[in-house]
Amino acid sequence: MIEIYIGNFTPGTYVVNIQKEKEWGIGQVQSSINNKITINFENVGKKTINPREVELKIININGTI
């Protein structure tokens, strides 16, 4: 299991959900509080995610991984 630290996901960071990348699209972190990250994804809207349960990958602002 990959350890992910909540501090990596600051507001404004762009991410993709590794398992749902094509379905959800690119997301932008809105907040990260108490091991919960709120992200607004382009295809499915706002999701609140526990980074210990969902693998997220940080991407650059142009959307390339």
Q: How would you describe each model-predicted region?
A:
Residues V16-N17, G45:
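N-terminal non-cleavable signal-anchor helices
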Residues W24-S32:
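Short beta-strand-centered aromatic/proline hotspots
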Residues M1-V15, E23, G63:
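Mixed-charge, Lys/Arg-rich low-complexity intrinsically disordered regions
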Residues I37-E42:
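SH3/SH3-like beta-barrel fold
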Residues M1, G45-I65:
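Intrinsically disordered, low-complexity, charged/polar segments
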Residues F9-P11, S32-N35:
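A short, compositionally biased
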Residues I2-I6, I33, L56:
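Hydrophobic transmembrane signal anchors and adjacent membrane-proximal interface regions, especially
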